[in-house]
Amino acid sequence: MRHQKKKITLDRNKAARRSLMANLAESLIIYEKIKTTKAKAKALRPMVEKLITRAKTSDLHARRELMKVLYTDNVIKKMLEVIGPRYKDREGGYTRIIKIAGNRVGDGSEEAIIELVK
């Protein structure tokens, strides 16, 4: 029985879920606003918040911690040089989830926009 298990699985195994979250995080960092399902947005939010908090200190350890999750160099560079300093004085709440009215046509899933707070 899975009582009191809080992990959001998104109906994927661990490797597929990790890859999906990494790709969504990179897209959110590059475009600063993405449209996805509500469940994926809610799963992505804590991961991105922790990455931004890590990027606020732009030292070698922070770079290596970001490299564990994010794969492309330009995304890591943007995190350390642009996004980290932008939220230097903010303690948390770097992202916002906006629910979209109506459901997706193909499968009826609820959609949402997740964006970085300016």
Task: Give the role of each language-model region.
Residues 1-12, 19, 23-118:
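Structured, basic alpha/beta domains of bacterial-type, RNA-associated proteins
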